[in-house]
């Protein structure tokens, strides 16, 4: 007894060819999509590491400007001026404070908490209440070379350059200038 093998019809062959081509095209598109996603993720990590670190705010030393839980972007720049908000390394943490004075400049704070930079009263609309806070340095104070005098916006509770525990921030410890808030969405935008 012989087995008879039926030859597939032309229509069946065309359908099988379409199925195989579709499967190959699907695999190709899937592979390309995965490669594109991996590339985008790698570029995002590289950008976040080298140029725009993403940080989260912990604590209340920068209220009302920045609140605990805010997620911010910093820019790695080399120039910082009075009024800029910077992130810097301190005791294996990253702190966020506002620059009050740069290298060689003089800082003075009176009993009411008014801040003077080079004997000029600083206009500080971003603070809610003036306070001398914890201060164990001798005033007026001259900022050393390659360092920045920083203070938190919530002056009463912030531990910053007014304390010898923190002191002035060395330029090499600065992560970058805070430029943009990305979270919460209702406060999304540039940070001043």
Where are these regions (language model features)?
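Hydrophobic membrane-insertion alpha-helices, especially the h-region
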Residues: 32-50
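Soluble "head" domains of membrane/secretory-pathway proteins
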Residues: 2-30, 50, 56, 64-70, ...
């Amino acid at each position: 007894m012989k087995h008879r093998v039926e030859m597939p019809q032309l229509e069946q062959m065309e359908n099988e060819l379409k199925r195989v081509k579709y499967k190959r095209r699907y695999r190709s598109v899937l592979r390309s999509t995965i490669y594109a996603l991996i590339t985008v993720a790698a570029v995002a990590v590289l950008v976040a590491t080298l140029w725009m670190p993403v940080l989260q705010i912990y604590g209340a030393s920068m209220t009302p400007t920045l609140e605990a839980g805010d997620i911010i972007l910093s820019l790695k720049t080399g120039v910082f001026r009075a009024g800029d908000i910077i992130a810097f390394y301190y005791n294996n943490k990253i702190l966020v404070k506002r620059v009050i004075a740069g290298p060689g400049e003089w800082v003075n704070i009176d009993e009411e908490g008014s801040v003077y930079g080079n004997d000029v009263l600083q206009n500080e609309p971003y603070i809610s209440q003036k306070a001398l806070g914890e201060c164990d340095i001798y005033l007026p104070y001259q900022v050393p070379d390659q360092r920045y005098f920083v203070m938190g916006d919530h002056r009463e509770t912030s531990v910053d350059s007014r304390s010898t525990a923190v002191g002035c921030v060395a330029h090499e410890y600065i992560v970058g200038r805070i430029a943009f808030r990305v979270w919460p969405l209702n406060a999304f935008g540039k940070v001043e």
